[in-house]
Amino acid sequence: MNLQIIILAAGQGKRMYSDTPKVLHHLAGKPLLTHVVETAQQLNPDAIHVIYGHGGEQIKSSLPNLPVHWVHQAEQLGTGHAVLQAMPHIPDDAYVLVLSADVPLIQVGTLQSLIECSQRQNPDHSVLALLVAELENPSGLGRIIRNNQGEIYSIVEEKDANEQVKNIKEIYSGVCCTLANNLKKWLPQLSNSNAQGEYYLTEIISLAVQNKTPITSLTAKNSFEVQGINNRQQLQQLERIWQQRAANQLMEKGATLADANRFDLRGELYCGKDVYIDINCIFTGTVVLGNGCKIGPNCSLTNVTLGDGCEVYANSVLEGCHIANDCHIGPFARLRSGTQLASHCKIGNFVETKKAIFDEGTKASHLSYLGDVLLGKNVNVGAGTITCNYDGVNKHQTIIEDGVFIGSDTQLVAPVTVGANATIGAGSTIRRNVPPDELTLTESRQKTIYGWKRPVKRERD
């Protein structure tokens, strides 16, 4: 079977009150259009056609790597007109699945079932399959009109509906599947004699009835699958539905969330056994948490891997890091891209790292900046240690070998190497390589000025 998918993404989204096209607004860290394209890809179609119009160049430039065929709708004349723009690129014998870019939570299983509905009869008597739903509040959506035998014979958009039709709870989702040959016959016959003055795709139902093409429907099991986004309130509602589903899936696999309503996932999160996640944590990109990991409150992890038994304390920010087993991080730590910790390392409060590689058992417990640095095993980094890695033009590396003890308030001016088991005295500024096994410090003589008086403020007149 040749499957062609059309995604409608040309709408202006006026009710978003935004300079950003509606389909680029984010849900769970990804644009709405990306959600729909990723779902469509799971059906293994022969092609995905995205119909763009309003803000089209912005959409294309923002999502340059989407595996789609872009089709321009120069004038936004309605959904039927939008689908018509893609038809020259689709063979007559292909099955066409029409989706909407602002309906991001449609499930692949539902779409697969709809495609199967459209194939149940001989292709010579092809079916028009519609995805429908029963909603308690169907406001704003097209209503399904059935005859006395329960057969669908029309869809009426709300702006064209009378009060009797508005009381109908069954709605059309905007998702349909049929042979391309049918659409190529029906779409040129659409009329714009309606309240919007547009060419509605829903009018193909009446044309299918006239042509005696069977119409079948599939009712979505979950109403959220067919919920569209037209304003920011609806975007927030679907965000919470997506997050709740993600939280439930994690808990089903053995993770504990302190409060599923205060958890945000903006990518992929893979958890081992007995993982604990406290409140207000944000996971972005791809995050892997090993067995027994604990994430404290108010943490942000982006593209991070944690080994077994790690603990990240409150208010820590980790990005682009690889952490081995049994490490402790935070509170208030910031680990930036390129940070790698071997097992049993500790990064304490108000420590920032970037391109820092720690070997086993190394600790930086307080108030330090460690950038472009290699640290050996069992190094102790004292409070207030700074690697001075930037000369205003280039970055330089610091190498700290095994067993080094660095006293508090030390500046290491890169490029510099500290030899194994060396000790650096507190308050030192190290500009040259430090020999192993020795104490190195920079001394400034302490001086006491006897009889010195503090300045006294004069009383103002």
From Swiss-Prot:
The keyword Methyltransferase does not apply. Residues 233-253 are annotated as: Linker. Residues 1-232 are annotated as: Pyrophosphorylase. Acetyl-CoA binds at residues 383, 389-390, 408, 426. It comes from the Bacteria. Its EC number is 2.7.7.23, 2.3.1.157. The keyword DNA-binding does not apply. CDD domains: GT2_GlmU_N_bac, LbH_GlmU_C. Mg(2+) binds at residues 102, 230. Keywords: Acyltransferase, Cell shape, Cell wall biogenesis/degradation, Cytoplasm, Magnesium, Metal-binding, Multifunctional enzyme, Nucleotidyltransferase, Peptidoglycan synthesis, Repeat, Transferase. It catalyses: alpha-D-glucosamine 1-phosphate + acetyl-CoA = N-acetyl-alpha-D-glucosamine 1-phosphate + CoA + H(+); N-acetyl-alpha-D-glucosamine 1-phosphate + UTP + H(+) = UDP-N-acetyl-alpha-D-glucosamine + diphosphate. One of its GO terms (biological process) is UDP-N-acetylglucosamine biosynthetic process. Residues 254-461 are annotated as: N-acetyltransferase. PROSITE patterns: HEXAPEP_TRANSFERASES. Binds 1 Mg(2+) ion per subunit. The active site is at 366 (proton acceptor). Its cofactor is Mg(2+). One of its GO terms (molecular function) is UDP-N-acetylglucosamine diphosphorylase activity. InterPro entries: Bifunctional_GlmU (IPR005882), GlmU-like (IPR050065), GlmU_C_LbH (IPR038009), Hexapep (IPR001451), Hexapep_transf_CS (IPR018357), MobA-like_NTP_Trfase (IPR025877), Nucleotide-diphossugar_trans (IPR029044), Trimer_LpxA-like_sf (IPR011004). Catalyzes the last two sequential reactions in the de novo biosynthetic pathway for UDP-N-acetylglucosamine (UDP-GlcNAc). The C-terminal domain catalyzes the transfer of acetyl group from acetyl coenzyme A to glucosamine-1-phosphate (GlcN-1-P) to produce N-acetylglucosamine-1-phosphate (GlcNAc-1-P), which is converted into UDP-GlcNAc by the transfer of uridine 5-monophosphate (from uridine 5-triphosphate), a reaction catalyzed by the N-terminal domain. In the N-terminal section; belongs to the N-acetylglucosamine-1-phosphate uridyltransferase family. In the C-terminal section; belongs to the transferase hexapeptide repeat family. This is Bifunctional protein GlmU. It comes from Legionella pneumophila (strain Corby).
